[in-house]
Structure formats: structure tokens, C-alpha cells
């Protein structure tokens, strides 16, 4: 786990080598400063290489191969191919054996296989990488830069062009060192296309999308292409497997995904909440240890050596799960550390969580995650295993129920409701999803947009989360609805699959996995926040060997109707797969969204923080937010404990933090 920064100069065809060298020498100083801005990500080592028009920089958090041979950048034996890598690659030992005769490995770092695979497979090598990763590779012979990001966007990777230089980095803040002067992109803010597309809400700043790679050459425009995407079966096809066969298939793949993530030359711990996702991971780790699997660098494989960390919110906050987590830990016989998170602790971390996540999320769970990582770091632990990604793949959100019921599940007809009952249940679920977890819904979505989405019920929930009270002048940028931007952000192949081939539940899962998960959840409850305290998070539920199997599980086995209870059981197939590893309490517990506290009173620590940030001057310094509407939201949030008002208030406050720390000038109207 590390931080990377890179540049590729576009000197112009008329530039001499001398001019190019002079430009590069200046940019190298900027590269070093860009590494300073993400220095928290890699305190163990630092390195860079610069050759004419290219520079690659790296700060390292040592996890595997703690020796100097694991330091980066990496190079091939001809010194013509160079790479900087952030993340963990879990099949590195297999590929080392396979490629030992044709590549001279220097050390035992997992990330060293990137160059070896590139030399063996060419550009197709990215598909052979298994894990959480982002990297930049430079092939001097071909004058080719390649930057890529893992399949689900666990690691962040951004790019932009500043003063004739292509810049690529783990975090946007690194671009400030190269002279980036951020400006708000009002169009992407209004239509919220930044939630799905490569474009961010900063003009000219793009993300490498999950499952994509970027290629560029000197004096040529960069180009982004996909190397992987989620696939689902045809909704009319029948699944001939038995339920038990599918249960065993999920269990086998999840166990393997957990097991390979226990390897490290440093201590490894578990993030444990009160839900089935992290509890099943903890249960599997404990079971693997009993069978002799090492947990990180632990010498004794006994569960009592395993450490779990849990946020403990105030008991009356409605968000505390520590009592359940404690019971799970006691049942497993493992150590548990409760990290107390009261309102004062939450408010004190508000601005730092926004700055490091570089994204506004209308919730406060990122501050709890920041406190967790602080506690893990204080214990000398560098790696944690987490539960992110389960809800999206096993249908854990209540909002999925309406889409499950939108059409019969022809792949698993044995579980079908009678048609009359299905229609009644659909009407109720469709009504509930309007006022679901985020409380955002639009009745004005055009019919054409609805058809492109095959009338998915989760669209507004995803597209409008954290919507802003925009100033009236921003309509000059158009009135595209977020729902339209969401579906038009996908290519024609995906839209065709949605309208013709995929079951609506799979469409809903695709939408969540491509938007809310990588751009919100994994930024606020993942790498960006954990690495503030030099903690690497690993996500077994996002192992593509597992998810490609789960994506082919019939919808009715993910969200199963239980006729004897006249209710639905979310994540049914996961519950059955992990039943041997969790308590009866966890097996039977209903899904509860992992969110921070949602009710705060006037005069409290958070209210004081909001009053400090959300002033008339600060709101007007954004340029695109209406002050009167913001005042109204703040009033509702704290005097009426209105959840919509709180979400809107938090979102505005987070944009204010980003604007101030990035030095963004106020947005203005389009010129006449």
C-alpha cells in the first residue's frame, strides 16, 4: 500500500532534448512536492525516477518484503520499463514461479510482478492481476505510459493535464504541486455525472475508472479504455444447479478470498461491526487460524492472537453496533478493541475526513473509520481485513427489493411468488424505496430515461444522494437530470443489457457497484481514510474470483422470499454460505446500513462545527450554492432533527472544506 505520482511531459514537436531536459528538471522538483502531499501514505520509503519527459514517484508502506528490494520504482533488467504500484497483488507467488525463467526478480514484493507480466502478456497483463491496485508503468522503448486501476476502484487513481504535462496520482491533492488551480465544474455538479463518469467536480480532473486503464505517449492525447466489467446471466436462462451447490460455491470462493488476504510480513487485524459481512470475515479468519493459517506475521496460529476493532458510538445514537460485535468476538474467542466515538470526536475529524477522501458524502461514518484506523495504527498494525462490497453483490440493500419483484425470476422458478402476490409486494416495495436510506426521490424522470433504466427503482436513490441547494444561475449549464446522467454515463452495450438481458435486480446491483460503491463507500470507508494512519484495508468480498461467481447466482437466492414468514431475507445465499462461521444472532440479524449517527442537537459539537463552516461568506465562496436554502437546511437539521436537512447541510459543509483546502475560486455563470 503506497502513494504514487507521475508526470509525462508533452514538450511539443519542436522542442530540443536540451529544452526537454530543462523542463523535466523543474518538474522533478514538483514531483517531489507532490509526494510530500501524500507522504502519509508511505512513511517507510520514498523513490522516484525521471528520464527525459517522464517521471514516476512513490512513497511506500511496507507490507510484503520489508527489505530495500521492495522499494519502488521497479525496473526491468534492461532498465527500459519502469513502474510504481499501489496495492496488493495476491497471485504473485504463482506468477513468480511461472515467469522465473524469463524475468529476473530482485526481491519478493508482490508488486514486482507487474513488469514481468507486462513483458510476458503485453497490454493484456492487467487481466492477470488479482487484488486491490493502481499503477503507472512506462515503456521507454515504445514511449508508452500505462496507468490502471483495479476492477472495483478500491484504490483511487486520478489524472489531469497541467501546463503541457499529463499528471497521474493516487490523490487529487498531488496535482497542486504541479500548479493545478482547481475550478468547480458546475455542469457535472448539477447533473451529478461526476458520480459515474471519469470527470470529477474539478474542471479537467479525471479519475481512471474502475476496471479501466489509461494510455498516453509524448505529444499525444491520453485515452481511457476498459479491461474488465461486471457480467450477469440472461434473465430468461434457467439455472440448473442446486441451492446447496451454489452455497458451497460461494463458501469455497469466499474462504479463498479471505485466506489469501491474510498474507503479510506485518501484523493483520479485522474491522468488526454488528453485521454479517465483517462477522463472517472474522469467523472465517478464526477458523483458518485454527487450521494453521498464519495471520500476517503472527508466529502462533491461534484465534486469541487475532485483534478486532469496532467503533463504539454513543448508545443512544442509533448507530452503535459495539454490543453485537463484542458478543461475536467472545464467541470466536478473539480480542476486541472498542474505539469510542462520541459527537466531539466525530466533529473534530470532520474536515480531515473530507480532505483525505476528496469526496463529499452525506453521512458521518468516515469520521468513525478515521478513528478506527488511528486505533489500529497505535497498536502497530498495518493491515486490516474489511467487509466492503458484500451488500452490492449479495443484495443487502432494502432498495433492491422492488427491483427483485419487478419481473419474475425465470432462472429460479421454484421460488416464484404467485403473480398477484408479486404485484402487491412490488407496489409496497416501490413505495418504500422512494423514502429509503437517502430519502431522495424524483417524480419527474423522463419516460425515455426510465426505459433506458428498465424502470429500475433504485435510480433516484443513487443519482440524487447528497443533492445540493443550487443557486438559480446554475441552470445556465442545463437541466439534465441526475437519473439521465447516470444511465447515459454507461456505454451502449450496458444500456442494451439493462433493457433486454439483465434481471432488474442485477441492473440495480450494477448501478450501485459502478457509482455509489467506488465513488462514496470505498473513499469514505476504505483506502483514502485508512491510509491517513498508514493502514492498508483488504476487501475479500471484492475478489473478482468470488464476485464473478456471485453475479451468476439467481436473484431469488440473493434476496429470498420466505413464505412461512411472509418476508424477504436479504443476502440469503451469503447467510447460508457463512452459517458455520457466525453466531445464530448474526445469521438471523436483519441488514442495518452502516451509517454514522443521524440526529444532533443545537449547540452540540457538530452544530458548532457546522456553524463555523457553513457561513454566508463560505457558502458564497462556492458560487454555486444558494445561501437561503442552505440556512433552511441547517435549521431543519438541528432544530427538527430532519435527516434530509442534515444530509444537505453535511454535503454543503464538505464542499466548503474541499473548496478551502484546494484553494478553489468561486464558480461563475457562463459568459454571454
Swiss-Prot record:
Enzyme Commission number(s): 3.-.-.-
Annotated source species: Penicillium rubens (strain ATCC 28089 / DSM 1075 / NRRL 1951 / Wisconsin 54-1255)
Pathway: Pigment biosynthesis
Keyword ATP-binding included in the entry's annotation: yes
MF GO annotations: asparagine synthase (glutamine-hydrolyzing) activity; ATP binding; hydrolase activity
Gene giving rise to this polypeptide: chyD
Record: active site: 2
Pfam families on file: Asn_synthase, GATase_7
UniProt xrefs under InterPro entries: Asn_synth_AEB, Asn_synthase, ASN_synthetase/amidase, AsnB_N, GATase_2_dom, Ntn_hydrolases_N, Rossmann-like_a/b/a_fold
Classification lineage: Eukaryota, Fungi, Dikarya, Ascomycota, Pezizomycotina
Protein's name according to its UniProt entry: Amidase chyE
Amino acid at each position: 500500500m503506497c502513494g504514487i505520482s507521475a508526470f509525462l511531459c508533452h514538450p511539443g514537436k519542436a522542442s530540443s532534448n536540451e529544452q526537454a531536459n530543462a523542463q523535466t528538471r523543474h518538474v522533478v522538483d514538483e514531483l517531489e512536492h507532490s509526494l510530500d502531499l501524500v507522504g502519509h501514505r508511505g512513511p517507510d520509503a520514498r523513490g522516484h525516477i525521471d528520464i527525459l519527459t517522464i517521471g514516476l514517484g512513490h512513497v511506500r508502506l511496507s507490507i510484503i518484503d520489508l527489505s530495500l528490494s521492495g522499494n519502488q520504482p521497479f525496473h526491468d533488467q534492461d532498465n527500459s520499463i519502469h513502474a510504481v504500484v499501489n496495492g496488493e497483488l495476491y497471485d504473485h507467488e504463482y506468477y513468480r514461479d511461472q515467469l522465473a525463467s524469463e524475468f529476473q526478480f530482485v526481491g519478493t514484493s508482490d508488486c514486482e510482478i507487474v513488469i514481468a507480466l507486462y513483458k510476458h502478456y503485453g497490454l493484456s497483463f492487467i487481466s492477470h492481476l488479482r487484488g486491490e491496485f493502481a499503477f503507472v508503468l512506462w515503456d521507454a522503448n515504445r514511449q508508452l505510459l500505462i496507468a490502471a486501476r483495479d476492477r472495483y476502484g478500491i484504490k483511487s487513481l486520478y489524472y489531469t493535464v497541467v501546463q503541457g504535462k499529463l499528471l497521474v496520482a493516487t490523490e487529487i491533492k498531488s496535482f497542486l504541486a504541479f500548479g493545478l488551480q482547481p475550478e468547480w465544474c458546475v455542469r457535472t455538479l448539477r447533473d451529478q455525472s461526476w458520480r459515474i463518469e471519469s470527470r470529477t467536480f474539478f474542471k479537467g480532473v479525471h479519475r481512471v475508472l474502475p476496471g479501466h486503464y489509461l494510455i498516453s505517449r509524448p505529444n499525444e492525447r491520453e485515452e481511457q479504455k476498459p479491461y474488465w466489467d461486471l457480467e450477469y446471466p440472461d434473465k430468461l436462462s434457467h439455472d440448473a444447479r442446486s441451492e446447496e451447490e451454489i452455497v458451497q460455491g460461494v463458501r469455497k470462493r469466499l474462504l479463498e478470498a479471505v485466506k489469501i488476504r491474510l498474507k503479510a510480513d506485518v501484523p493483520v487485524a479485522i474491522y468488526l461491526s454488528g453485521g454479517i459481512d465483517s462477522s463472517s470475515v472474522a469467523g472465517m479468519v478464526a477458523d483458518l487460524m485454527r487450521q494453521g493459517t498464519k495471520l500476517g506475521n503472527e508466529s502462533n496460529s491461534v484465534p486469541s492472537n487475532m485483534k478486532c476493532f469496532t467503533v463504539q458510538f454513543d448508545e443512544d445514537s442509533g448507530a452503535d453496533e459495539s454490543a453485537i460485535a463484542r458478543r461475536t468476538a467472545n464467541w470466536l474467542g478473539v480480542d476486541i478493541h472498542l474505539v469510542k466515538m462520541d459527537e466531539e470526536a466525530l466533529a473534530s475529524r470532520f474536515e480531515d475526513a473530507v480532505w483525505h477522501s476528496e469526496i463529499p458524502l452525506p453521512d458521518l461514518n468516515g469520521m468513525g473509520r478515521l478513528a478506527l484506523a488511528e486505533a489500529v495504527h497505535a497498536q502497530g498494525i498495518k493491515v486490516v481485513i474489511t467487509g466492503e462490497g458484500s451488500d452490492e453483490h449479495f443484495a443487502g440493500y432494502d432498495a433492491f427489493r422492488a427491483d427483485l419483484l419487478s419481473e419474475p425470476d425465470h432462472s429460479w422458478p421454484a421460488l416464484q411468488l404467485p403473480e398477484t402476490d408479486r404485484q402487491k409486494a412490488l407496489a409496497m416495495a416501490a413505495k418504500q424505496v422512494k423514502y429509503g436510506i437517502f430519502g431522495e426521490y424524483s417524480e419527474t424522470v423522463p419516460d425515455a430515461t426510465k426505459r433506458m433504466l428498465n424502470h429500475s427503482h433504485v435510480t433516484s436513490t443513487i443519482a440524487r444522494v447528497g443533492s445540493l441547494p443550487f443557486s438559480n444561475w446554475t441552470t445556465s449549464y442545463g437541466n439534465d437530470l441526475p437519473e439521465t446522467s447516470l444511465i447515459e454515463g454507461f456505454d451502449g452495450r450496458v444500456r442494451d443489457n439493462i433493457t433486454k438481458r439483465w434481471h432488474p435486480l442485477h441492473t440495480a446491483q450494477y448501478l450501485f457497484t459502478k457509482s455509489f460503491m467506488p465513488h462514496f463507500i470505498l473513499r469514505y470507508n476504505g483506502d483514502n481514510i485508512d491510509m491517513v494512519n498508514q493502514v492498508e484495508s483488504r476487501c475479500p468480498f471484492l475478489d473478482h474470483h468470488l464476485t464473478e461467481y456471485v453475479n451468476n447466482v439467481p436473484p431469488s437466492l440473493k434476496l429470498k422470499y420466505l413464505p412461512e414468514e411472509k418476508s424477504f431475507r436479504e443476502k440469503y445465499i451469503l447467510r447460508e454460505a457463512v452459517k458455520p462461521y457466525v453466531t445464530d444472532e448474526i445469521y438471523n440479524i436483519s441488514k442495518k446500513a452502516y451509517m454514522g449517527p443521524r440526529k444532533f442537537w443545537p449547540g452540540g459539537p457538530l452544530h458548532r462545527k457546522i456553524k463555523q463552516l457553513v457561513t454566508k461568506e463560505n457558502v458564497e465562496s462556492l458560487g454555486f450554492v444558494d445561501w437561503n436554502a442552505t440556512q433552511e437546511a441547517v435549521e431543519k437539521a438541528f432544530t427538527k432533527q430532519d435527516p434530509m436537512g442534515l444530509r444537505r447541510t453535511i454535503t454543503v459543509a464538505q464542499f466548503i472544506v474541499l473548496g478551502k483546502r484546494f484553494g478553489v475560486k468561486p464558480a461563475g455563470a457562463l459568459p454571454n
